[in-house]
């Protein structure tokens, strides 16, 4: 058994760690609320944009935009959104597992894949995973703007326009609630058709002044908005996961401190008992 001094040093060390994890929990809680506000403000735009684009994909247009054409999936691109930092539980691990499983299916079907990682953890993972990394972005911070992502996203869009990609997906952690964040893979290109209107009726629009000019701008903006929404959803998920992980670490530290204090008291009691025994033995010898 370690002596009382060593145990006391361990207790002090764990207490210092507990203070750090407790502070990180409070910081993550504050950042999560701000991230939730940003996510909630942009989510209606992204969802309604997806609905409108779904209706466009079902419409009968004289001008067929390349994003509306379904091609054989010979090469597939993934925009994978992760965190820049760790200490957020299994958030990134679960996301990467989902991507790897989907990539395996694509490769079994004979398709090649390339990646556009967003976030330091994603960049690090896919540089070692294997496969072409066409573009990447990291260090976006807790409040990224759309302009921070445009350059990276445009690289993948240009590859699609040139026929180098036949499918484009965005992968991120969707924020459900504080305790639940779900990794999702959403198809960006070709444009997914609206599921809710497939049975009831088809939508069509009148385009002024020119369908080509409008769609060229609208469809690019749609892809950018979906990627941006994925990023803000992932940030909210990151802060929620970090808050939960740091709370668990703080609670575990408290339990460890209690256990160490019990061991410390036993060691101290044993030392006192030994000293008393030595005193009694010495007195008896005299």
Curated annotation (Swiss-Prot):
Subunit details: F-type ATPases have 2 components, CF(1) - the catalytic core - and CF(0) - the membrane proton channel. CF(1) has five subunits: alpha(3), beta(3), gamma(1), delta(1), epsilon(1). CF(0) has three main subunits: a, b and c.
GO cellular component, one term: plasma membrane
Gene3D superfamilies the UniProt entry points to: 3.40.1380.10, ATP synthase, gamma subunit, helix hairpin domain
Function as written in the Swiss-Prot or TrEMBL entry: Produces ATP from ADP in the presence of a proton gradient across the membrane. The gamma chain is believed to be important in regulating ATPase activity and the flow of protons through the CF(0) complex.
Membrane disposition: Peripheral membrane protein
Keyword line: ATP synthesis, Cell inner membrane, Cell membrane, CF(1), Hydrogen ion transport, Ion transport, Membrane, Transport
Species name: Shewanella piezotolerans (strain WP3 / JCM 13877)
Stated name of the protein: ATP synthase gamma chain
